Design a protein with these regions (language model features):
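Short, polar loop motifs at secondary-structure junctions
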Residues: 2-6, 75-78
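Nucleotide-activated donor-binding/catalytic signature segment of Leloir-type glycosyltransferases, i.e.
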Residues: 3-37, 47
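Short acidic active-site motifs
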Residues: 7, 26-28, 59, 98-102
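Nucleotide-sugar-dependent
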Residues: 26-33, 38-64, 70-82
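CheY-like receiver
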Residues: 31, 102-106, 136, 140
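Conserved acidic donor-binding segment of nucleotide-sugar-dependent glycosyltransferases
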Residues: 57, 75, 87-97, 105-111
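A charged, aromatic-enriched C-terminal amphipathic alpha-helix characteristic of glycosyltransferases
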Residues: 94, 110-141
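Generic C-terminal helix-cap and adjacent flexible tail
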Residues: 142-146
Length: 146
């Protein structure tokens, strides 16, 4: 998504955050590994909620596999946010007002960052392990014929 100059200025805060722009897909995981906090965002203004309600973004499994703290922003009644909440795999912000408070709390509490990173990694290993999913799938499809 291309951002306006105003949006770039709002996101780039001196000493806190910077916007790198676009990177090739093969560099995404490398950049995620370098990050302290991964930010997952859904539409908190209800514009696309009907389509996002039951969606499960592949970005979720990508983030979980990195073993990094996740800050998830979005309404509490959509699948991705419900999943993060149930799994205790992210710090949740359901409104715009919660973002700064939750982010400051994470920055001031490295122990909480590490705990949430561990929760995310464990959730990814437990629920999104490709080998385990293949085994379950083939077992369901082929049953005793394996």
């Amino acid at each position: 998504t291309l951002l306006t100059e105003v949006q770039v200025k709002q996101l780039a805060v001196d000493g806190t955050s910077y916007l790198k722009g676009t990177i090739p897909q093969d560099q995404v995981k490398e950049e995620q590994i370098k990050s302290d906090i991964l930010v997952f965002v859904e539409d908190i203004y209800d514009i696309h909620n009907k389509t996002a309600r039951l969606s499960f973004s592949t970005k979720i499994t990508d983030y979980l596999s990195q073993g990094r703290c996740i800050l998830a922003i979005g309404p509490n009644d959509i699948a991705s946010m419900e999943y993060f909440t149930e799994q205790k795999a992210a710090i949740i912000c359901n409104t715009e007002d919660e973002i700064l408070t939750r982010l400051q709390n994470l920055i001031e509490n490295p122990t909480l960052q590490r705990e949430m990173a561990t929760n995310a990694r464990i959730c990814g290993e437990k629920n999104h392990n490709a080998d385990m999913i293949k085994k379950i799938f083939f077992n369901k499809v082929l049953g005793d014929k394996l």
